Amino acid sequence: MTFRFDNSYARDLEGFYVDWPAAPVPAPRLLRLNRPLAEELGLDPDLLEREGAEIFSGRRLPEGAHPLAQAYAGHQFGGFSPQLGDGRALLIGEITDRAGRRRDLQLKGSGRTPFSRGADGKAALGPVLREYLVGEAMHGLGIPTTRALAAVATGEPLLRQEGERPGAILTRVAASHIRVGTFQFFAARSDIDRVRRLADYAIARHYPELASAPEPYLAFYEAVAEAQAQLVARWMLVGFIHGVMNTDNMTISGETIDYGPCAFMEGYDPGTVFSSIDLQGRYAYGNQPYILAWNLARLGEALLPLLDGDPVRAADKATSVLETVGARYQGHWLAGMRAKLGLAGAEEGDARLAEDLLEAMRSQRADWTLTFRRLAEAVTDEGALRPLFRDPAALAGWLPRWRARLAPDAAERMRATNPIYIARNHRVEEALAAAHAGDLAPFDRLLEALADPFTERADRELFALPAPEGFDDSYRTFCGT
């Protein structure tokens, strides 16, 4: 099968990676192929159904593939690790999709690499299918994200903390896999030439309009800050908690990447944490905008020598960008919140209106997704929100203020903005448990709902319901891919 690879990272950035083959697997089996994505990439899904097990397991890569493990560093929970890199993943190449966009193809769970740091480099079935589900859920919500092209069972059992688990490999598609940590890897070694080469490559690939800017590296820094501020605002608007916002998990492209311990919040609480390794709550839901700024500061540090030859002026320029991050984020968040609330135009008191609703939701632990979805019904039915709030009077003072700001077509706009289906934790776990037992039908049904999250259907009612009371209080997520 022809993939039409054009591997610019391997060609232009020698020394930024290690050539490495995928580990052999005993009995690969294609579990799921993302046919719409395959077509978007200009690939033949029918051929991939037949040949995908061999290709996406790494056992028989297509002509032109160039498997490599990328080098990067990163701050993990605030502590700097000068060498991380692809410890269980291989970039196999780049292709141009039907829209003319360059896309990376990466195998996750393909075995040890020189960056594995003692791990086996493999991925278990559950985490692979989880990333597939959540990535497609984010895509359905219109949030920039890496996506899953395929999931392959390897036929190899893996020993994990919870016992023996079947092995699997995810084929991930991304605008690129360049991270804040990629810049940090070379900056930590004072290799300014490679920092510059990486910046030039990233500009050419993601922000080509900046190449002719008076200060292209400063403009690049601003562009990444803008892309990430918009991304994190969109996470917050749907109640998404990434769970591991390390600098090696922040892309230059502005896509969501690495879904290991992520989850969607149900009852609204800014302190919500699901990740089993986030013991201090560093990456809690409400902290994500602050970590956004912290991570961008680390990118600024890596770029300092490119911003100006004078260290003081370079620091001033980086600071001038960082000082805009809060306003950038707030602007995107407020614009999104106005849409979620169905407001007409923009008025000065809109932020307070939104914050007052959130405070009422917090005090009642109201379900994030259903509250905003049922607001569309509350345009004409005051009782629509009562089942979601323990205190029926919680919104008594807020509702008249909100109604006074509504656009004429508010209900219709709100239903197109506020999803009815998200990847609720208990439904994801049910789908994964069934998959472990050999039944992928629940996975398929959930995936179908998540691909169309704004269209409410009677036969999907179960996917809209919150978890049983107490489920999320003890629910924990893990870094599995």
From Swiss-Prot:
The keyword Phosphoprotein appears for this protein: no
Active-site residue numbers: D248 (proton acceptor)
Entry keyword Transport: no
Binding site for Mg(2+): N249, D258
Gene Ontology MF: a single term: magnesium ion binding
HAMAP family: YdiU_SelO
Family: Belongs to the SELO family.
Names of the cofactor(s): Mg(2+); Mn(2+)
Protein name: Protein nucleotidyltransferase YdiU
